[in-house]
Structure formats: structure tokens, C-alpha cells
Amino acid sequence: MLRKLTVDQINDWFTIGKTVTNVELLGLPPAFPAEAPREEVQRSEEVPSEAPTAQAQDPVKATALARPASAFGRSLSQRSSEVEYINKYRQLEAQELDIYGQDQPPSGPGLRSPLAKISNVACIPETTYKYPDLPINRCKEEVISLIESNSVVIIHGATGSGKSTQLPQYVLDHYTQRSAFCNIVVTQPRKIGASSIARWISKERSWTLGGLVGYQVGLEKTATEDTRLIYMTTGVLLQKIVSAKSLMEFTHVFIDEVHERTEEMDFLLLVVRKLLRTNSRFVKVILMSATINCKQFADYFAVPVQNKMNPAYVFEVEGKPHTIEQYYLNDLGHIYHSGLPPYRLEEPVITKDVYEVAVSLIQMFDDLDMKESGNKTWSGAQFVSERSSVLVFLPGLGEINYMHELLTNMIHKRLQVYPLHSSVTLEEQNNVFLSPVPGYRKIILSTNIAESSVTVPDVKYVIDFCLTRTLVCDEDTNYQSLRLSWASKTSCDQRKGRAGRVSKGYCYRLIHRDFWDSAIPDHVVPEMLRCPLGSTVLKVKLLDMGEPRALLATALSPPSLSDIERTILLLKEVGALAVSGQREDENPHDGELTFLGRVLAQLPVSQQLGKLIVLGHVFGCLDECLIIAAALSLKNFFTMPFRQHLDGYRNKVHFSGSSRSDCLALVEAFRAWQACRQRGELRHPKDELDWGRLNYIQIKRIREVAELYEELKNRISQFNMFVDPRHPVLDQEYPYKQRFILQVVLAGAFYPNYFTFGQPDEEMAVRELAGRDPKTTVVLKHIPPYGFLYYKQLQSLFRQCGQVKSIVFDGAKAFVEFSRNPTERFKTLPAVNLAVKMSQLKVSLELSIHAAEEIEGKVQGGSVSKLRNTRVNVDFQKQTVDPMQVSFNTLDRPRTVADLLLTVDVTEVVEVGHFWGYRIDERNAELLRQLTAEINRLELVPLPIHPHPDLVCLAPFTDYNKESYFRAQILYVSGNSAEVFFVDYGNRSHVDLDLLREIPCQLLELPFQALEFKICKMRPSAKSLICGEHWSGGANGRFAALVSGCPLLVKVFSIVHSVLHVDVYRYSGAQDAVNIRDVLIREGYAELAEESYESKQSYEVLKGFFAKSVDTMPDGSVSSPMKDDEKHLIQILLESFASNRLGAPNCKAVLHGPFNPYELKCHSLTRISKFRCVWIEKESINSVVISDSPADLHQRMLVAASLSVNETGSTMLLRETSLMPHIPGLPALLSMLFAPVMELRVDREGKCYTGVLCGLGWNSTTEAPILPEHDIELAFDVCFNVEDIVEINILRAAINKLACDGPHGPKYLGPERIAQLQENARQKLLGLFCRLKPREKITPQWHEKPYEWNQVDPRLVIEQAEREGGPGKSTCLYQLHTPVVLSP
């Protein structure tokens, strides 16, 4: 045995390629015990003894099977290079093993580790336990002897033979009886398996859970220092041994279900195998499975003995609990009569017919139960007292829900149906193990979670659709996708073994026998060959065992070299591995671990979420980022029930506020829940559940998020990252700045998941809406003839969206307009978003109607036929239904404006540039005096109906101590009062409900005299957007001061949807008039903007109108006899319909829509996805995005936290999205700020930057882009200069100071210094975006060679004098960019 290993020798051993010297060996190599025959697992003579075989088949062939698209595309030389890399490093490993070939640990039952210690358990209970009669019990002593005599033992036994539950207990009892120390760990692939087995053992043995036996799954640990048998998930054990670089904490390591071949499983086997041969030689390893490829695993764990590789010992557990009969579709001809279509390997699917076969089988089981109970005849009116349970294997939640619905409709069959899926709650999982009500049959609908992790003992029947969903990595994009595929024979055999635990079992495979034989694969493709390797490579780097490819070449199924290369590049892109300053020195197979990489390797979250946490620490928003990372790592705690999806969506939008970010909605909801708990409002479980239901939040999941949040806080504390307990000094702008910084941090963490939106065609959109306001209106199609008859049905369909103001019927189209609060800022109404969301959710909009011919036949002898497709306006505010003239809305001259120059008094400021007022010329003043006098002469009566928003009435207002009534519109009702808007003046007031009065009809005829104004050609500056809700508090205060205290002169530019777009002038003493827009722009609150297409059209029309004599203009208000006739016929029809003279509606009309032509479509910025179709998941706030400012051509940016692709790779699905503020140049700024490498584009004269190419850069050796798929090419739409690039570099350097290794790194800084660096980073970030003078707008110029690197003359590149950490050696998060010199 080894006398002594020094630290240096151990480190040398861990680094593949280094030789270990000066090792003293003692003792002779032991012989294997006589009771361990090895004939069945000996290697064939063809396998070289010095190279351990990883798998039965060629690893490169396995890779080809896993990735057919890439494998068939590879050249022969590329494939041979894959073989070379595996063979090279395996031979290296074999040579190093030769040093220790004679140094095997002595065998024998009395062996103990040198670190063995006496248990500190005060009293281990004497075992008088009688083991259940399972197959493994018959060979108990033999198995214990084998485990004690061998380093590695493989246990192969049928499902239900007792491997997982009994064997670890045998070892525990064996050591307990001898008063010897042991510490046994058993891995399970799933949490539910580890916890349920530990619970079962503790219950069987009457032990306290967490005492002698315990478990650890994820964040949940039920174990103490006295625990001697612990069950844990594969990942938990892997994290433990990677951190310790040793197995010596345990005496026995049981690895269960090794056939599953997950990435974690294969890496665990690799590390265990490595450690067994180095510093953990006394630990016993036991591999267990029912469907294991024994030779493959035995060869993999072979050890050199006397110049020969001896495979690990394989023990076969003979016998099965009970026989299991299996059947295929061929055997079920008596159930289905119509021929089922043949299955195809490339098209895994479940047809409706196959579902029906499964349902028929479940009904047939009563016959089987009766026959087995001895009752030969069964009438169907009775059931056996104990009906055996049925386990149905389905590929996913959607299929489970469909089958659940089929079975729950069979009420008379007395079935208790339970879903079993990773997303169901713990309580629902526990229901699976409960005995059913007597006389009822338990049906479990499960994914492959019940394949191995969960054993339900009373299952007699298994129905297997032979399908599964596997996580695969798309060849082109590297994005993950859950794909439906055929399960392997190994998995199906595991499923079969779930039956027959207590009696004879039956397994029904719903495929044909010949398809099983010829098409179903034998084994599952290992995850290491089909999934991203990021977390595995980081753990390899943490182990410091040399290049990742060197270690991974010794895996059971080595990943392809190209996959390792790609993983290294993706880790460099995220910043976990350093990007070399010298691109030609870049190692495609390795990289230096950065501070970020070390953090990521310790966190149980994805690389992007780990980066989010680190960037949150840098910019002082760590708490928010921890919440987001915890929430996105687990199942979404927002719930959107099937029939309440719109309500759930509305609730999520409410939590997001105006941020339009799913991530920020998570933060706000989590903090709202936390605040309620801290206030004691959720002290009782029922109160908490009620709060969750009210807010569409799943309480169990938000609690899990809280646990992970605390766990992440604890883990990052080792890196000197702490949430600041001090409350920040709050100023008016702080919450808005914090929100913006968090949005930027999200963009940094999720680079390069960047998307923009296509621009709507304004001209076409105006036509589609017939000139109506897109912010308040949606379009419906397929309106039936005489559609106006059904306006109440239509109104009720949209009631869940918002208050409908009017509906205009125009032929087969209808325009539904929602009420807008006149005192809220211009934006697309939430009601419009919800209406479009209804269309996206395919909510059925169905009307009960009369056939057109029936209406014409029953009313006035068919004279109403002229109304079949006439234009009709239903105004719910005025409660009128009137025919409409042909109108172009914005092109009509409004009757309320007699001149383009007006003098106004401002009565209500909504926000900067948006206000209400009224004309103060003599003519208008006289009109208002007469109106007020007429109102107050009348005998006013109380409202005949309950007040509601949008109702026009009369309300009191006191002016100069005199109370008078004025026309008003109710904005909202709260308790016994209402807020009203005075429609002739533009101001608002709170009024008691009992003071409101009904408005006489004649007072509604005069148009409302208050005017709504919007300053034209102006938009908020970046500073205003960042420091406020669209406009900053400072901007609002400055504007209010400019427009108050004196009359204003306004010059009308255009009239759009009854809003006057104007230039506003203020006279100040004897000075000239001051243009308020110019003042706001000069002071940095605003910037110039383009007017919309509608506004420009209106401007041209108004110029024409006022160029002519007003007297010659036609009066559009004059009613024509034809319209009077139409109105009379409409009233007749409405009365006939209301009085039911037409009879009951006998037809249905399904409407199409609703639509809004300004809805935006998303496009990816990365090269590989630029032309792929992009969908945003329906649960996202941004699944509906409607343009508020179509005239603004600057790109709007969207960031996605995660992406996946469909099975064909043609469509991308975005999840957890955030819509960034509409700041000109934002996509370019964020891309340059967070890209690993960038190359600036210049115009032909070299005088200005025209764009940028972002990515991992260019390799001058290979003369090719390093990661071309993720390159982002952008053309600038604002002007950037050298100073901007310098500012970006300064900010990147500021980030590095809080995200780097070394003696001056953040791990060694005090809290005050960290706070200073954080504030410095925040201020530099805000300074980059908030400029007094906005960046000049330019016309985008696309580079003539898009996506091509190395296009800049090297003589013009400004090399950075000092790169942090030195050239090519830096482990900082971001390298500094190289600016390009511009010509004067």
C-alpha cells in the first residue's frame, strides 16, 4: 500500500499529463477472494489491457448517434480527430495507472479506513428487525462479503428486488453488530426518490428521520452528525466530493440507477473512479441498477492487477418479486377494431386512438381482477373489494392533463386519478402512496419520474406509451429543447418492473411488437452527448485536473471534442473563463477560471443566473438579483389557471408596474409576500393560501424561492458578497434609477439574448383602423350582417378587458374603443393589451345571431336590407346608436378649432408636454357663461343609476366661494365619493356621490369645450426616462412651472384623435415669447422627435382648410335625410330585437380577432437566429407588445432570460423577458458594454463610427470568427465617438474591480470600500446613458461586409496601454475594448 503521499504528489496526480515520482509502496498485491468468480465479466482478448474501455460501443459512434445532424456532416478527418483525443488521454491515464498497478488496497472484511473513528452515537438500537422477503434477502451474507472484499461491486437485479432499500441497511446492520464505524451514502437521481426511501426506512425501522437515517435533497437536509445512512440526490453528492476532492467522508458510496446516464451521473462516476485510484482507496463503491449494461460498467471500473485490467465484480440478484406478463398492440386486437396507423421512428406521437386503447384497457382490468379472484362472470354492476392500482407512463404534463380529463369523465367507474410530475406539490406526490377508497381503483399518470425514483407497491398494471421527453441541445443555436422521443428499451424495462411488486403483474406497451424489435433503441443516449456541458466543465476546472478534454476523455461516454470546444467558448462568452488578450494564443479547449467562474461553480443555478448575482453585487442591486436568480431557477410561482389565464396575466402585469419585465414582476411579488408575512398578515396557513389565490401566486413555490434565496445568500458570502442591510438614502429619483440599473444588469447577465422589434407600417395601420386611435382601439373581423344588433353581446365579451366606450360597425369589421382616463399619460391602454391577449389565447368570441334573410323577412318587408352592411356607431357614453357618414377622422376639420393660434388657460397638467385647458377668447368665454347659467337654472335631479366610470353627469365645483354645477365625466368611484373630470374646463375634483346629478339629454348635444394638448416634436430624454416614470420628477416640476401662472399662446400643428399637437409659447414680462419645448430640450429634460404619420397628414390637411375661407367649408354636422331614414330603421330593428319579435337567435357567429395593427413582432440580434421565427411565451408580460410611438424609428430592445427552440429548430421561444427603456442607441450601448470583444465599423472616409460587431472576436491563426453564431452586428442610429468608447472601458474596468481574483480582489475588501466601488460603478453607468446633450441621431449605415471581423486597418487601432492582469493573463470579467482612430 502507499506509505505516504505528499500534497505535491496528490496535485500532480490530479493533473493529467504529469508524472508522480518518489512514491514508496509496501506489501504485496492481494489476491481476489475465492468467493468472487469473475468469468462473466472478464474482458475479451481483443481489448487492450492498458486502456480502460469506456463503453461497449465506440464512443465516437455513440456521439454520432446522439447528434446525427453534425455527425453526418463531419468529414472523415474530423471524426478521426474525435477518436484521437479520446485515445490520447486514455492512454495517458493508463500509463499513470501503471505506477500504482501493484498497489491495491488489501481486501477482507476487517479492513477499515485509516480515518475510521468510533461512532459518537450514544446508543445505536439493537437490530431485531425482520427484513421483508425480497430476492436480495436470500443472498444477504454473500453480497456483504463481496462489498467488503472488493473496491467496486456492481449489483444487477430486477426492479423490486430490494437493492435501493435493503442493501444499504444490510451494510449498516453489519457494521452496527460489530460496533464498527460506517458512514453510508446512497444516491438517487431524483429528490422524491431520496426523500421517500429515507422516510420509508425510518418508518419501517421505527427510527427518527434525521437520526440514524436521513436525506439531503437540494436545499432540504434532514440529517445530523449521528446519521449513518443518508440518501441524497446525485448532484448533492457530486458537489460534496468536488469541493472536498475526496470520498473519505464516507465508508460506502451506493450509486443507484446508474443506467440513467445523466450528465451529473456520468461526471459523478468519472470523479469517483478517479478518486478511488488516488486518495480514497479504502472507500467501497456499489453501483446498482435493474437494467445496467454490466460489462460496460465493469470494464470502466477495471483496475490494473499483475499487468492486466481486472473488471469490477458483477453480482446478479436472482429472481423477481412476481412474474410480469407483457403485451403489445398486436395482442390487443379485441380492444380496438379500427386499424391503428403504423408508428414511425422519426415521428413520436400519441394519437387519439391510442389514448382510447389505454382507457379501454383500464376498463378491462375489472374483468381481469374478477377472473383472478375466482369470479368467472361479471355483470359490470360490481367491483372486487380491492382493485389493484394502474401506473400509466406518459411523456409530459400536457399528455397527463389530457388523459386525466378522459378518466375523470368516467365517474361511474370509480377511479381515483393522481398525476405524478416534477411540478406537482409534495402533498400531491404523497397522495400517490395512499391506499384508495375501498372499491375504487387508483390510477397514477406519471412521467418517467416513476420509472426508478418512486415505487408504489400496490401497482399491478403498467400501461406504457413508450415515449419520453429528453433535453437536447440544438445543433445550430446551442439552445436547449425538450423533444418528444421514443423511450429506450432499458427505460421501458424499468417501467415494466414497477408492476408485480405484490402479485403477478401486467405490462401493456402501446406499440406494435415489430416496432419494439426494430425501432426502439436499446439504451438511452447519455446526456453528456446531447446536453450543454457548462456546469461539468466548471467543476472540472475547480478540481484543477488539467484541461477539461483530458478528464472528460476518460468519461464513460466521452463528449465529442467539438462539444467541449463549444462549451469552452460559451463559458468564455459568459465570463466564467477568461478571454485572452492575445487572440492568437486562445486555447479552444481550455481557459483560465475567472472570479465569476469560481462563483458559478459553487452556485446551484445556471451560468447566466450566477452572472446576474455577481453583476447585482457590482451595481448595488444584489438583493433583487438574488430573488430573480432563485425564482428563475425553480418553477414559476406565478400561476395562470387554464380558465383564468387573462386574470393571471393581468395580475402579473400589475406586479411589473411600468417596467414591462417578468423579472421585476417576480421581485415585486416576492417582496409583497415578504412584507405581508413580516406584518403578520399571513400568520395562518389559510390566510397565506387565500392571499396566494387572490394574487395568482403558488405559495409552496414562493416558499421554495425564499429557501433558495437564503441558500444563495449563504453561498455567496464566502466570496465576500452580502446584501446591504442598510436602507439607501431615498430621493424622489432613487427607485427609478434602481429599476434602470437592474434592467441593465439583466441585459448584462443574459447577453447575447438580445432582440429588437420590426417597425409597423404606419400608413397601412391607419387604414386598417380607419383613422381611429390605436392606443384605445382593437379591430374585429367576420362581423355578421346587422352586427349592431348584437352590440350588448360584444360589450360583454370585452368587459373583462376594460370599459368599452364605443363600438363602430363597418361592414364585416368592428372597431371596439375602450375608455381612456383623460388625466393619464398617452400610452396603449391595458384594455387593448388584454383584448389582443384574448386573441393570442384563442379565447372564443362567439355571438348568438339571426340569419340576415330571417331579419329581412320579418321586419318591414325587407326594407331594412340597406342596413345590412351600413356603418353604425354605438356610443355607450351617450347611450346612442347612430348611422355614420364616411369619415377620415384626422382629416376632418374639428368644429372646436376656428383658428390655428389659440390663447388658453391650463387647468390640468397630466405630464410634461401633455395638459388640458380651455380657450379664453371672448367668444368661448361667453359660450361657457351661457352653458353654466343654463345648467344652474334647471331643476336638477339625482342620478337614476349607480355612478360608474365613464358616466357623464353634472357635478358641483366651488369657485370664488360660489358653488355651481358643470358637465363632468366620472373617472372612478371610491367609497362614497367619485373623482370627476370637468369636460368643459379640463380640471378634476373629488365629489360626494350624493351631490352628483343627472344630465339632461339636450346638454349633451354641445361638444365638450375642454381641449387636450400635446407639445409636438418632443419626447423625453434618456435622463427623464431613467429618473422617472416616463418623465422625471424634475422635468414634471419644471414644466408645471413654465405653464402655470399666465395664459399661453398655442400654435396648432395637427389634430390627432381629438388631441391638439401644438407649439406652446409663454410670455414673460416684456421679453419675447419663449418656446417651452426649446427650454425643456436646452435643460436636458427632453429631445426632438418625429411626429407620427397621422399627425403629419393632419398638418397638411389643416393648412389646406385654413388657407380657404371658413365660410365656404361644408358643415359636417348637417344631417342628411338619408341618415335620418337610416337612423329610423336602426331604431325599428333594435326595438324588434329587444322585444324578441325576431324570435330566439338560431345561429352562431365566431368572430376573428381582436387585432391591433401596431402590435410588434420580435427579431433576434444574433447571427444564427436573425431569420428564425421568434415567439414569446404566453405567460410573459411581453407576449403582447403594441407600439406607443410608431414614428420613433430607434430600435426598441427586449432581453430574454432563457431561450429554447422547437423540435425543427425553426422557431425560438423566449421566456422571462424584459422590455428595455426606449432610449436611442440603447441596443448598441448595451452590446458594447457587455460583449466580450467588439470591433467598431467606420465609414469609408474614416470620419465616424457607423456600427459595431460584437462577439468573441477573431482568431488570426485560423482566420475565422471564434463563435460566429452569437455574433451581433449593429448599425448605429445615434452618433458615438471615441469618448463614448473610453467611457465604456472605464465602466468595464469599474466592474472588474468588484469581479476579479487576486490579493486586491473583492474577497479581501472591507464593506466600506466595496460600497465605494459599487457607487462608483453605478454613477459611471448612469453617466454613460444620462447626458445633458443627447447623442445626435444619424441614419443607420450597414457595413458592406456584415459579420466579418478584422475589417479595421491595424494602424488605426488604439491599443490599450495596460490591461488589467497583463496581456493574455487576465482573469478579469471584461477585457478593455480597442477604440479606432477617426480622421479629423
Swiss-Prot record:
One GO MF term: helicase activity
Gene Ontology BP terms: cell differentiation; fertilization; male meiosis I; male meiotic nuclear division; piRNA processing; spermatogenesis; transposable element silencing; transposable element silencing by piRNA-mediated DNA methylation
Pfam families: DEAD, HA2_C, Helicase_C, TUDOR
Keyword Cytoplasm applies: yes
InterPro entries: DEAD/DEAH_box_helicase_dom, Helicase-assoc_dom, Helicase_ATP-bd, Helicase_C-like, P-loop_NTPase, SNase_OB-fold_sf, Tudor, Tudor_TDRD9
Alphabetical UniProt keywords: ATP-binding, Cytoplasm, Developmental protein, Differentiation, Helicase, Hydrolase, Meiosis, Nucleotide-binding, Nucleus, RNA-mediated gene silencing, Spermatogenesis
Motif DEAH box positions after renumbering to this chain: 256-259
Gene3D superfamilies registered for this protein in UniProt: 1.20.120.1080, 2.30.30.140, 2.40.50.90, P-loop containing nucleotide triphosphate hydrolases (3.40.50.300)
EC number annotated for this UniProt entry: 3.6.4.13
CDD domains, alphabetized: SF2_C_RHA (cd18791), Tudor_TDRD9 (cd20431)
SS bonds (residue pairs): none
Predominant subcellular localization, coarse grouping: cytoplasm
Reactions that this protein is recorded to catalyse: ATP + H2O = ADP + phosphate + H(+)
Domain Helicase ATP-binding: 144-310
Binding site for ATP: G157, A158, T159, G160, S161, G162, K163, S164
Highest taxon of the lineage: Eukaryota
GO cellular component, one term: piP-body
Helicase C-terminal domain sequence ranges: 379-546
Chain's role: ATP-binding RNA helicase which plays a central role during spermatogenesis by repressing transposable elements and preventing their mobilization, which is essential for the germline integrity. Acts via the piRNA metabolic process, which mediates the repression of transposable elements during meiosis by forming complexes composed of piRNAs and Piwi proteins and governs the methylation and subsequent repression of transposons.
Identification of the protein by name: ATP-dependent RNA helicase TDRD9
Species annotation: Rattus norvegicus (Rat)
Native organism taxonomy: Eukaryota, Metazoa, Chordata, Craniata, Vertebrata
Gene: Tdrd9
